[in-house]
Amino acid sequence: MIKNNVFSKAAITGLLLIAVSLWMMAAGKVATSEIWMPDGFKVPILALEFGSSVAEIQKIVISISANANANILFATQIDMLFAVIYSLFLFFALRAIYTITNLNQYKWLALLPILIMAADIAENFQIVNALGNFEINLWVLKIATWIKWLGLAVAFTAVGRFLITTGRYFDKVLALSTYVTIPLGVWAMFAHNGINEVFAMLFYLLFPLTIIYAWFPGVKKKG
């Protein structure tokens, strides 16, 4: 099955991505009831990523217990590895689409995950600084955060643009789901409430669905 699969590299990387994702979620699991977060936020790490000011970020960090801080810090460090793996997954997926379609736009879009990875790592460094009570650069955090999230939206929309051309129902549902990401991301960029988490959580759905597609694409390798 995997031998003739044009998405084989993405499929295998996807399994590693799932494993690291589960590790990261387990490591960062904390009781959130005592953590102060802005209205609409329920996930501490997302509240930190989308922090609107240094004072707000510091208020969140101060409310986090020492044990919870250690867990979130460890999960953030794992996220450095996670960023590399999901970027590889997207790179392999977009390269596979380029192989199938021979459209140059996918050849160049396959480079987008490199920018996303760099932004995610820069964002994580700022969060590590915040958790360690070191100085943070709010503009670096904001710019890196939105390059990452909007970059993911563009990457998945590009995948969706290919999937909409196939005949399978699953592919079309996945494609339509990716089309929501850019408008939702633009809305979230100018908001500071629950819509930020809805936007981020959408990718928790899109990644596993795209991994499933990578394993069962219905497209065989040529030659």
Which residues are covered by each model-predicted region?
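Aromatic-anchored segments of alpha-helical transmembrane domains
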Residues: 19-23, 114-122, 179-190
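Membrane-interface loop-to-helix entry segments
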Residues: 73-88, 140-154
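Interfacial helix-loop-helix junctions of multi-pass membrane proteins
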Residues: 125-140
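N-terminal signal-anchor transmembrane alpha helix
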Residues: 4-40
